[in-house]
Amino acid sequence: QPAFSVVTRPTFYKLLKAGRDIGYDGTYTTSEDEWIANFTTGWSDQLSRRLSTRLPRLYTRNGKIVRICPSLEYLFLEASEPFTSRGITRHVAATTGCVQDLGTDLDFIRPGGAITGLCS
């Protein structure tokens, strides 16, 4: 059983050009023009800073790997277009974190919608 779960809601989506760094010290760099979803949760919500480079990678329906990039206040998750996630369908365990029970139908997450199951 997970020790805790995080429930968060996307607050906005932004199209970033290729080569744009996200997070402290450029934790993630866009390799192409990408939509990024912003979730208002992070270290201030007691997510350990040790998770910074150890958070799981999420696999999407099209097989693309998505990286969660926490910063002081936010989690960033790649999105395919405004107001639409790529539909997280499974989890992959990481060293100190996992994503669990996210369901199979998250294709349409708008600001105010919820994503659950990030655990450590």
From Swiss-Prot:
Keywords from the named record: Isomerase, Pyridoxal phosphate
Enzyme nomenclature, EC number: 5.1.1.1
Activity versus pH, per record: Optimum pH is 9.5 in the direction of L to D, and 10 for the reverse direction.
Cofactor(s) it depends on: pyridoxal 5'-phosphate
Pfam families referenced in this protein's UniProt entry, alphabetically: Ala_racemase_C
Catalytic activity: L-alanine = D-alanine
Biological process terms in GO annotation: chiral amino acid racemization
Residues of the active site: 24
InterPro entries (alphabetical): Ala_racemase/Decarboxylase_C (IPR009006), Ala_racemase_C (IPR011079)
A molecular-function term among this protein's GO annotations: alanine racemase activity
Summary of temperature dependence: Optimum temperature is 37 degrees Celsius for both directions.
Family: Belongs to the alanine racemase family.
Known role: Highly specific to D- and L-alanine and does not catalyze the racemization of other amino acids.
Subunit record text: Homodimer.
Name listed for the protein in its UniProt record: Alanine racemase
Protein's organism: Penaeus monodon (Giant tiger prawn)
Lineage, highest ranks first: Eukaryota, Metazoa, Ecdysozoa, Arthropoda, Crustacea
